[in-house]
């Protein structure tokens, strides 16, 4: 019994290490491709921080998902929802709004589900969606 507990503890520790490594590498390298966008958030004092995020286009709206543990950018945009969005040839100011309507959330999740292995690698974080509404 003691040996089993020890093995389970080691396995859990290794798993936590893999999650931390995976999340750290994604945050450090910020991989870009045709399905990503650059989201610039502004801290108080107007310090810009650029994050590369997966772009979700759903029912004529643009979204990003908050589905990793490192999410300082998300806390920043909750304080200041004015952001800059760039992808492809597009570059525009927007207002970031947390999606709270359960039907809208369900619709996006149905359209863009996460695979089990991605959720495993990221440590099963909660998933939120942010709608990016172009500023006029």
Identify what each model region corresponds to.
Residues 36, 63-65, 127-131:
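Ordered hydrophobic segments in well-structured contexts
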Residues 19-40:
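Aromatic-capped interface at the extracytoplasmic side
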Residues 39-65:
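N-terminal secretory signal peptides
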Residues 6-24:
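Hydrophobic membrane-insertion alpha-helices, especially the h-region
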Residues 42-49, 69-136:
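Short, structured beta-strand-loop surface elements
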Residues 1-5:
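Short, Lys/Arg-rich N-terminal segment immediately upstream of the first membrane anchor
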């Amino acid at each position: 019994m003691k040996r089993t507990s020890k093995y389970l503890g080691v396995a859990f520790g290794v798993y936590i290490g893999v999650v931390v490594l995976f999340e750290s590498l994604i945050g450090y390298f910020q991989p870009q491709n045709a399905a990503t966008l650059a989201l610039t958030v502004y801290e108080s004092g107007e310090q810009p921080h650029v994050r590369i995020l997966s772009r979700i286009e759903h029912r004529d709206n643009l979204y990003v998902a908050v589905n990793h543990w490192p999410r300082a950018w998300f806390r920043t945009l909750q304080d200041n929802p004015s952001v800059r969005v760039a992808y492809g040839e597009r570059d525009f100011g927007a207002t970031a709004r947390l999606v709270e309507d359960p039907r809208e959330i369900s619709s996006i999740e149905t359209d863009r589900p996460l695979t089990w292995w991605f959720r495993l690698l990221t440590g099963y974080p909660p998933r939120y969606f942010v709608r990016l509404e172009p500023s006029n």
